[in-house]
Amino acid sequence: GQQQRVALARMGAARPGIFMFDEPMSALDSYLKSALEQNMLDLFDVCNRTVLYVSHDIDEACRLCERICVMHNGHVEEIGSIEDVVRRPQTLAALRLTGCKNTSRARKIGEEEVEALDWGMTFNVGREVPDNVAYLGIRASYFHVDNRAERGRNSYDLHVARVSDSRFERLVLLDAPRVDAPTRLQWKVNKVGVPADGLPQAGETLRMHFDASKIHLVCR
């Protein structure tokens, strides 16, 4: 991180009209990245200049920037505040950039119903579905086990194909109903304070519920 700190000092001394950064922390470990982020925020506060910051890390961008521009294949897909881009993405590129692990081609099948073509699943989204809807997205932490006796709307019995653990989460891969689905659904489970036998296990079948308000619809 020393080279990056020296570069920051040189940039500040030059007093440019615009600061431009191209993934300056991509090669740093988490400790150095956190320290350098604080140095950069201090510099931004003191210099009061426009900053153009390029990153593939949405959390990094949210911490350092006020507005986000989503680029895909050299074109601007959308631009807006962090709230707009993260909470209300308008394109598939924005969905994926903001960390949405589960995306599928989609088509409208009812006033408030949409079919996830890649998964063989249908959802009632509780709002009008655009006629030209093209994709839907569901974030990996936005669905949960449905403990009701009867399967309700937006609930599916899904087989746990595989699990893998990080320090604080378990990633659960769920087989979609469509036999030849190109991808599995990813579900993130917080495992802090949860006994091992209370976590999802490979081979289980779980009834999962997908909250209508948490299903993103985009038209391109």
Language model regions located:
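ABC ATPase nucleotide-binding domains
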Residues: 1-93
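Residues that scaffold the ATP/ADP-binding catalytic core of kinase and kinase-like folds
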Residues: 85-88, 97, 146, 218
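C-terminal boundary and immediately downstream tail of ABC-type ATPase nucleotide-binding domains
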Residues: 87-110, 137
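Non-catalytic connector elements of ABC transporters
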Residues: 112-220
